[in-house]
């Protein structure tokens, strides 16, 4: 008898284990068939956990911004004069003596001050002793080399970001974002102790590679963390964090006159990167498309707890599960449509980065009060970023980019009229920067929504190359001397107008699902309207409410009929009275 009972118990245990395994298998299969966009929307348009993760990654703009703009304050342009036997001789930017041979000191014409006998270069800037250029003996170097701290930063980004983005597509967004953020912080700390300019440039290249990597992958991840409706809010933290990074740089500049201390203090908040490892989750889009069901379960568990909801995901299912795809650069080159998207979006990014950063860097050297000009240039971005929210909700992505590019073109042409007036020139350039800020906020979201999930980070990094070219060119705009002096502004305005034309030829992405792979770009049905899903979701919820009401009414009716007939019970064909 005991043997029989034991065998029954073992049988029950095996049966329950099989049921549990089958349940887990079914659960995993359901997770593999999830639609990524509908999955995110299941937590609502503004789920707490989704907003939290968006804030985490977009805060990184603070550190990127400060890493860029600190260079404007550690190597301000030098005002120099040459002293020769208690006399002052005019010199060029590279310290070449410029005198007429027929006049006094004509024998020194063409010589270099500091090298010619009895000559001495004297820097007249009040705080020149704190300047990186003076510290590394670069006072008389060509302006191309003086700006190389910014240039090498971007060159490092161009080289590294495509490779890091491919790793992000293959191994996930989180490890790349966190690792590069921490490495950028450590390299920034080390750069403030650089013994010479060569070491400083090597570290700046590494910082640029890491900084652009975390920012590029974070931009992609943000669109994957949030629902389509909430993506308009990306610009809030993005612009506020970026502007605060600029203001932080300015505040530190006012704290100390020593360039090394300026650089060190500005870099300190970068310790934030270590916190990301603990708090930042992996992108749900990436987890679903890569069939990482166990990690997705952990994400769901945390999201359910933070959002205080437990979605069923019944309306988020697709007919088939995702095949794990590792689409390569070769697959990208095989798609003409994707190449067109890369070209058009890349050109737009190049132009807006050129305009945006050129104005930002020129505000420090524009004349007048450089602190005030840079402060205006920093703070103007906050209202510009906030304006994006209603604009994106009302107009989508495409029309905002087109109109802002047109107004940016007109502003750049307007600058040429007031080149000799500091106040008017500053105001019109700030108008152009407002337009550039709005485009810079909207266009990365728009471009990200056009690229497939399987190669989204790779595409974003390739688009980053022309963008980086715009950044590389931007600090040199202030050094261009042409006759007439309005030509550079007209040329940039022409590029801006061409960008508006290219934007007109691209498609709107508002209310559209993110394409999952390269093939889905060729099939519109694969990227159908999300608004249809929202309508079906709302209608199903109303139907559900109606069905619940009908069930309650049926229960009421049945209970009333039962109460009336409680004295009669039927068994088969016979009636018995209680």
From Swiss-Prot:
The keyword Transmembrane applies. Residues 1-30, 532-561 are annotated as: Disordered. This is Putative transporter B0361.11. CDD domains: MFS_SLC22. GO terms for cellular component: membrane. InterPro entries: MFS_dom (IPR020846), MFS_sugar_transport-like (IPR005828), MFS_trans_sf (IPR036259), Sugar_transporter_CS (IPR005829). SUPFAM superfamilies: MFS general substrate transporter (SSF103473). Residues 532-550 have a biased composition (Low complexity). It is found in: Membrane. The chain crosses the membrane at residues 51-71, 148-168, 182-202, 232-252, 263-283, 339-359, 373-393, 399-419, 426-446, 457-477, 486-506. It is a multi-pass membrane protein. Belongs to the major facilitator superfamily. Sugar transporter (TC 2.A.1.1) family. Keywords: Membrane, Sugar transport, Transmembrane, Transmembrane helix, Transport. It holds the Pfam family Sugar_tr. One of its GO terms (molecular function) is transmembrane transporter activity.
């Amino acid at each position: 008898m005991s043997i029989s009972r034991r065998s029954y118990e073992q049988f029950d245990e095996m049966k329950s284990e099989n049921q549990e395994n089958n349940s887990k298998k079914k659960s995993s299969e359901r997770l593999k068939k999830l639609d990524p966009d509908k999955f995110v929307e299941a937590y609502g348009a503004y789920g707490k956990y989704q907003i939290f993760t968006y804030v985490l990654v977009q805060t990184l703009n603070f550190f990127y911004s400060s890493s860029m703009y600190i260079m404007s304050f550690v190597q301000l342009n030098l005002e120099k004069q040459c002293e020769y036997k208690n006399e002052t001789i005019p010199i060029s930017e590279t310290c070449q003596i410029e005198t007429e041979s027929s006049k006094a000191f004509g024998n020194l014409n063409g010589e270099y001050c500091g090298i010619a006998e009895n000559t001495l270069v004297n820097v007249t800037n009040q705080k020149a002793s704190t300047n990186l250029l003076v510290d590394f003996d670069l006072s008389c170097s060509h302006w191309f080399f003086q700006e190389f701290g910014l240039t090498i930063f971007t060159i490092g980004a161009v080289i590294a970001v495509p490779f890091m983005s491919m790793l992000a597509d293959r191994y996930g967004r989180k490890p790349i974002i966190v690792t590069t953020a921490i490495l950028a912080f450590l390299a920034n700390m080390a750069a403030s102790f650089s013994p010479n300019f060569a070491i400083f440039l090597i570290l700046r290249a590494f910082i640029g590679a890491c900084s652009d990597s975390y920012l590029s992958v974070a931009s992609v991840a943000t669109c994957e963390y949030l629902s389509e409706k909430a993506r308009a809010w990306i610009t809030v933290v993005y612009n506020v964090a970026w502007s605060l990074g600029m203001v932080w740089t300015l505040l530190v500049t006012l704290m100390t006159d020593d360039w090394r201390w300026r650089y060190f203090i500005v870099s300190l908040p970068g310790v934030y990167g270590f916190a990301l490892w603990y708090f930042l989750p992996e992108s749900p889009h990436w987890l679903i498309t890569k069939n990482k069901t166990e990690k997705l379960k952990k994400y769901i568990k945390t999201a359910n707890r933070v959002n205080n909801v437990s979605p069923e995901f019944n309306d988020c299912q697709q007919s088939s599960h995702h095949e794990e795809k590792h689409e390569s650069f070769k697959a990208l080159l095989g798609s003409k449509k994707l190449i067109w998207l890369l070209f058009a979006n890349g050109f737009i990014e190049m132009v807006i980065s050129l305009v945006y950063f050129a104005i930002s860097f020129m505000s420090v050297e524009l004349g007048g009060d450089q602190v005030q000009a840079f402060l205006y240039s920093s703070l103007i971005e906050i209202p510009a970023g906030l304006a994006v929210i209603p604009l994106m909700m009302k107009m989508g992505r495409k029309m905002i980019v087109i109109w802002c590019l047109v107004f940016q073109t007109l502003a750049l042409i307007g600058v040429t009229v007031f080149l000799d007036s500091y106040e008017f020139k500053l105001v019109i350039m700030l108008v152009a920067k407002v337009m550039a800020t709005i485009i810079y906020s909207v266009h990365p979201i728009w471009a990200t929504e056009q690229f497939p999930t399987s190669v989204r980070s790779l595409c974003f990094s390739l688009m980053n190359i022309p963008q980086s070219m715009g950044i590389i060119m931007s600090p040199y705009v202030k050094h261009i001397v042409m006759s007439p002096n309005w030509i550079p502004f007209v040329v940039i305005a022409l590029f801006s107008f061409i960008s508006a034309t290219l934007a007109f030829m691209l498609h709107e992405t508002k209310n559209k699902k993110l394409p999952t792979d390269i093939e889905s770009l060729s099939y519109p049905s694969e990227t159908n309207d999300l608004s249809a899903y929202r309508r079906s979701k709302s209608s199903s919820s109303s139907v559900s409410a109606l069905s619940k009401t009908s069930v309650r009414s049926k229960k009421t009716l049945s209970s009333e009929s039962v109460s009336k007939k409680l004295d009669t019970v039927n068994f088969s064909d016979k009636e018995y009275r209680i």
